[in-house]
């Protein structure tokens, strides 16, 4: 079997195509969530804290030198990325939970209780009576 034919079979399988669509949609979803966090969620939080723009929060590690900018530790961007992650994680968890609830087999009603048979003593007494005959 040629490599090209094997690759074609691999690429055309349903799982690979589903995964490709998922990656594309995931990339677009990530951009939407990033915009939601940086443009909608963080500005009001910054305003409530006292007019802080989280994008600008940073600690200067080394001052600027000739021809080089100052070295900055931008923890504000890190905080925004944490919010991005939390929103994406909650969304993915919710979708997986919804899909799993749809995949569960419907619960089967319990079978009606079977009538109890004779007890061991009753069976032994019946055998004894049969042997006496």
From Swiss-Prot:
It is found in: Cell inner membrane. GO terms for molecular function: mechanosensitive monoatomic ion channel activity. Its main location: membrane. It is a multi-pass membrane protein. GO terms for cellular component: plasma membrane. It comes from the Bacteria. It holds the Pfam family MscL. Keywords: Cell inner membrane, Cell membrane, Ion channel, Ion transport, Membrane, Transmembrane, Transmembrane helix, Transport. The chain crosses the membrane at residues 10-30, 76-96. Homopentamer. Channel that opens in response to stretch forces in the membrane lipid bilayer. May participate in the regulation of osmotic pressure changes within the cell. Belongs to the MscL family. This is Large-conductance mechanosensitive channel. It comes from Haemophilus ducreyi (strain 35000HP / ATCC 700724).
């Amino acid at each position: 079997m040629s490599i090209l034919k094997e690759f074609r079979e691999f690429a055309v399988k349903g799982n690979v195509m589903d995964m490709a669509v998922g990656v594309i949609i995931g990339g677009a979803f990530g951009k939407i969530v990033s915009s939601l966090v940086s443009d909608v969620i963080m500005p009001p939080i910054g305003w409530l804290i006292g007019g802080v723009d989280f994008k600008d929060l940073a600690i200067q590690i080394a001052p600027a030198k000739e021809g080089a900018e100052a070295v900055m530790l931008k923890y504000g961007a890190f905080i925004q990325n944490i919010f991005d992650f939390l929103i994406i994680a909650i969304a993915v968890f919710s979708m997986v939970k919804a899909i799993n609830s749809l995949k569960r087999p419907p619960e089967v009603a319990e079978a009606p209780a079977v009538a109890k048979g004779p007890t061991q003593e009753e069976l032994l007494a019946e055998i004894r009576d049969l042997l006496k005959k």
